[in-house]
Regions:
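Soluble extracellular-acting proteins and domains
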Residues: 50-51
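A composition-driven surface/loop motif
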Residues: 68-188
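Structured surface patches comprising rigid loops and adjacent beta-strands/short helices at the edges
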Residues: 32-44, 57-69
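Boundary at the C-terminal end of the N-terminal hydrophobic targeting segment
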Residues: 17-24
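Short acidic/polar N-terminal linker immediately downstream of export determinants
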Residues: 25-30
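Sec-dependent signal peptide recognition
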Residues: 2-10
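Short, isolated positions in well-ordered beta-strands
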Residues: 31-33, 56, 151, 180
């Protein structure tokens, strides 16, 4: 018994020496929660798991795993592919952003609760789609980084623009160095 307790203690010490991240996959969204920030994770009525204020219906979770991925707080990475979109969200802001997509047409709603305490959210956009768009609403400033994005909106779902940001505050747009970015709005 003493050997088992020593082994578990040693394993816990070794695990804490490496930055660990709890990854929660729901459809095309990967939420990444640094273990150092997660705290208590209430499991309610066998149907809901809450991590850092973000509620997940257990039935909606496709996969959960732990790895040593470094997580940048306040970041959302969006990668467009021909007919879909993959999203990675930092756990500290997971409860403040919601996503809806139809193929590569993506809508992001940033909660009205985002403020100076939460901080500015940075969205990195990359990938390529000949029929996609980004529509985003929010009431607090944000940053949108174009990081090798080719996006054409041929059949609008949310708006006619390749990127349409409706924000109550400043939106900082940046084009990452050494990248080519092409945006084409829908005809009309």
């Amino acid at each position: 018994m003493k050997k088992l307790a020593t082994f578990i203690y040693t394993l816990a010490i070794a695990a804490s020496a490496v930055a660990q991240t709890l990854n929660v996959a729901v459809d095309n969204i990967l939420y990444q929660f640094p273990a150092s920030q997660t705290g208590a994770m209430p499991y309610t009525d066998g149907t809901t798991l809450t991590i850092m204020g973000k509620e997940f219906r257990v039935a909606d979770i496709d996969n959960m795993y732990i790895d040593d991925t470094a997580v940048t707080d306040n970041s959302v990475d969006v990668v467009f592919s021909q007919s879909d979109v993959a999203i990675t969200v930092a756990g500290n802001i997971a409860k403040y952003v919601s996503f809806t997509n139809s193929g590569a047409h993506l809508s992001i709603i940033q909660s009205a609760d985002v403020d100076d305490a939460v901080g500015e959210i940075a969205y990195s956009l990359s990938g390529s789609s000949s029929d996609g768009e980004l529509y985003m609403e929010g009431a607090y400033k944000c940053e949108v980084d174009l990081n090798g994005l080719t996006l054409t909106n041929t059949a609008p779902v949310y708006s006619g623009a390749a990127i349409n940001i409706m924000n109550g505050k400043r939106v900082k747009i940046s084009v990452k160095k050494s990248t080519v970015n092409t945006l084409t709005d829908a005809a009309g």
